[in-house]
């Protein structure tokens, strides 16, 4: 079976693009927004809607394989790829990547993924944006699965010499800034790993001595013990602090 055509469509992600540099420089929360001036190239606001690109492989039998190109919340920070805007990258996919697949046989996932993963963009001389590779390889996996009438997990297991898990894979839930109310929802639904909690600002969230994050972790522990649906529920706590503790304690690991 062959890939007849590659089609792209712009979309929105489930979360946001946040300018981490501006937030660390003091941009303040205002509801779901941040007030401040963007400091990272590409941003027009400190927080703006996350963007995605849906990549669709139209197959010979009429089936459609899907993949979603999406980037991380803090795009452009810490050496990451630049802000992923659909209007900038749909032309790249259509002009440079679609020809790698259109009219080609569907082979294996690894072989098809390598076409984009290991390719060098003729327009930049670099490998493609991580979001592009993430989404296009998803479409490759879905195409192989559909051509073989298998689940995507089965294709991965077969190609990498492993087995599909017989147990549920733990999923990490993220609260965003509403770290108290959303933690309650996670506890109610027995989330495996929680809550992320988005401690990305020293003064307002972490505390100048780390006291706010300490208070939150204590509250979270007690909340689980008080409200968990059963005693067998013992979730993993994952708190993301975005390097703020290094700022608070001046990178003193003994503090």
Pin down the residues of each PLM region.
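Short, Gly/Pro- and small/polar-rich lid/capping loops
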Residues: 1-56
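Extended, Lys/Arg-enriched charged tracts that mediate electrostatic binding to polyanionic substrates
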Residues: 23-38, 144-148, 152-157, 161-165
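Short alpha-helical segments and helix-capping/turn motifs at coil-helix boundaries
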Residues: 39-42, 51-53, 138-139, 152-158, ...
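Solvent-exposed loop and beta-edge segments used for protein-protein assembly and interaction
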Residues: 47-51, 135, 163-165, 231-233
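Short beta-strand elements
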Residues: 53-61, 65-71, 180-195
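Metal- or metallocofactor-binding catalytic centers and their adjacent structured scaffolds
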Residues: 58, 64-148
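Glycine-rich, aromatic-flanked loop segments that form ligand/cofactor-binding clefts
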Residues: 58, 141-144, 157-186
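Metal-dependent enolase-superfamily TIM-barrel catalytic cores that perform enediolate-based chemistry
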Residues: 171-255
